[in-house]
Swiss-Prot record:
NCBIfam families: PRK04180.1, pyridoxal 5'-phosphate synthase lyase subunit PdxS. D-glyceraldehyde 3-phosphate binds at R174. This is Probable pyridoxal 5'-phosphate synthase subunit pdx1. The active site is at K90. GO terms for cellular component: phagocytic vesicle.
């Protein structure tokens, strides 16, 4: 696997920079999980910047268990035909053939996702070989930079998708922010040692120090269920928000979807966030993350190599 070089990361005409520029277009937006063309249209009308096409939302994947794979390409194409906004779809970690299929049918972004069953316990997909931008999850700076070195054009927190509990997304966002702040005052020798410590390419660690942030967009994901959740993640420095089960497992999906979009747009205005939070109907019941058991393979946020 050819890792991302410093030249690729900074050259505006490199394939990586072109793909990361496409992801930049989603900045400040909300990406919503959908399972039908009708849901996709609801998301688009609510102001979503993109949709994630799935056969089952994460809450149902948790509930029914079994092996979770890439969604049916025919179903994904139906959603692509139903909306004008970008369409994403998930593949299993390491399953490069699923990614080849999604690229072939024309999805706009591919999410190499821990929500699905892992296909390769040793390797992630070499994302630099694809024309389509990839999204990957992270829990800390090391994971984020390893995924970027493989070609990921967009990063998201892992959180705990399908729970409606935002605690892990908050933990992961704060962890990345803390580590970025930590390296700001490091000299070159310390940077070299720290890059080895977090198992990340030195060139990318230097780039993070220079920028004071990740070199790609960084979205919140996993457990975001309310306008307040979304606004909090934005105030923590996220570039946008993924919302899955929190919308279509709620009492009034269309109204909640619009409210979350407004909360992300006006995240620093408590008056607007308070207003859009009124009368949304029942939120998804959710699962307290503390009740999840690793032995049942339900703690998706722990999946990483």
């Amino acid at each position: 696997m050819e890792n991302l070089t410093e030249n690729q990361a900074t050259n505006n005409n490199s394939p990586f920079r072109i793909k990361s520029s496409l992801a930049q277009m989603l900045k400040g937006g909300v990406i919503m999980d959908v399972v039908t063309p009708e849901q996709a249209r609801i998301a688009e009308e609510a102001g979503a910047c993109a949709v994630m096409a799935l056969e089952k939302i994460p809450a149902d994947i948790r509930h029914f268990g079994g092996v979770a794979r890439m969604s049916d390409p025919g179903m994904i194409k139906e959603i692509m035909n139903a909306v004008t906004i970008p369409v994403m779809a998930k593949v299993r970690i390491g399953h490069f053939v699923e990614a080849q299929i999604l690229q072939e049918i024309g999805v706009d972004y591919i999410d190499e996702s821990e929500v699905l069953t892992i296909a390769d316990n040793e390797n992630h997909i070499d994302k630099s070989e694809f024309k389509v931008p990839f999204v990957c999850g992270c829990r800390n700076l090391g994971e984020a930079l390893r995924r970027i070195s493989e070609g990921a054009a967009m990063i998201r927190t892992k959180g705990e998708a399908g729970t409606g509990d935002v605690v892990e997304a908050v933990r992961h966002a704060r962890a990345v922010n803390k580590e970025i702040k930590k390296i700001q005052n490091m000299d070159p020798h310390e940077l070299y040692t720290y890059a080895k410590e977090i198992q990340a390419p030195l060139e990318l660690v230097k780039e993070v120090k220079r920028l004071g942030r990740l070199p790609v967009v960084n979205f919140a994901a996993g457990g975001v269920a309310t306008p307040a959740d979304a606004a909090m993640m934005m105030q923590l420095g996220m570039d946008g928000v993924f919302v899955g089960s929190g919308i279509f497992k709620s009492g009034d999906p269309a109204k909640r979807a619009k409210a979350i979009v407004q909360a992300v747009t006006h995240f620093n205005n408590p008056q607007i966030v308070a207003k859009v939070s009124e009368n949304l109907g029942e939120a998804m019941v959710g699962i307290n993350v503390d009740t999840l058991k690793d032995k049942e393979n339900q703690n998706w946020s722990t999946k990483e190599k």
